[in-house]
Amino acid sequence: MYPLVHYYVNKQVFGEVSHLTALGALWPDLAVGAGGDRDEAHTRGVDFFNWCSANMPDALDAARGMIGHGIDPPCVDYYADEYWPDHIRGYMFREALPYLAQVAACTGLDGDTAISLLPPGGEPPRSNVWWKAHNLIEMSYEMITASIDPQIGTQLLESVADAKAVAILSQAIHRWLGLDAGAITDIYSAVPVSYALVDAGALAQAKVQAASMHHRFSNYNVDIPALAALLEKISCDQAEKYPIFMDLLVERTREQLKPYM
């Protein structure tokens, strides 16, 4: 999931989200840009918590944010990306299925556009279109979250702007994993331009996706207005489902975090 959803879940779980918790919740999706490993960042939150307990207790809030983002123990991204009871991947991938042809048309990405509901087990099909479509479902959740809580993007950016908190987390991850602390600091400084946070509307989200596809796929064929229109449609389609899934994320994440509170 994208940053606003993680922050929103943390607000429901913690009440008040510390800057370090917010920064820790961003880390799993930033790790690659700082020389880390995405899968490791999504599965080693508890390891980081234990390391912080022994070596750097002032970074424990960041570890809590990292745990809540990840897939082991099963928290937000586990249900969004990895597991849903009737499907081979998580809920966001399931919800993306009706939009594959439209995503292919407005992004120029290739891949199977006829993927159907697949039971758990086996190997998920590889498809750039399906992956991007699941990103758009996630972005629609950013849009809905911002409409419910208009100040949430500003609150998140206050955490990113907290140089002391960023320095604490950068040093902790540097000492834990050996990654360059400067690279970690730099990747956090890029957050305001890497995501649509204050203006989380469809056009802003579409522009972020276009920039991502330029970088990741050298794809300059994105139809930004068409992508924005598709995001608006998806957001409307997801509006009634949003509170049900978000309540589940909050409930499951709160339960998994109890041993670390």
List each language-model region with its residue ranges.
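N-terminal leader/auxiliary helical segments
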Residues: M1-I67, I71-M261
